[in-house]
From Swiss-Prot:
Quaternary assembly: Interacts with host MAVS; this interaction may reduce MAVS ubiquitination.
Main location per the UniProt record: host cell
Phenotype when changing residue 37 to G: In strain: AH-1
The protein, known as: Non-structural protein NS-S
Other facts: Expressed from the S segment by a leaky scanning mechanism.
Assigned keywords, A-Z: Host cytoplasm, Host-virus interaction, Inhibition of host innate immune response by virus, Inhibition of host RLR pathway by virus, Viral immunoevasion
Localization, UniProt: Host cytoplasm, Host perinuclear region
Signal peptide location: none
GN (gene name): N
GO biological process: symbiont-mediated suppression of host innate immune response
Length: 63
């Protein structure tokens, strides 16, 4: 009986936002392999996250 192999699918973050109750909600989709789009999305997320933290009086030094 052949063993079942699990394949890791790289995921791309497409959207991030806060829900009404304050929880962070992340939207993912399978990676299409377009690394330029991927980079752009991560860059937008970084900027968005930075803005969220600044609004809350925090700063994100590591990103």
């Amino acid at each position: 009986m052949p063993r079942r192999r699990w394949r890791w699918t790289r995921m791309t973050l497409t959207r991030a936002h806060y829900k009404i109750d304050g929880q962070l909600c992340l939207h993912w989709r399978p990676n299409s392999g377009n690394s330029r789009d991927n980079l752009q999305i991560w860059w937008q997320l970084k900027n968005w996250l930075q803005n969220q933290l600044i609004q809350q009086g925090l700063s994100l030094m590591t990103i």
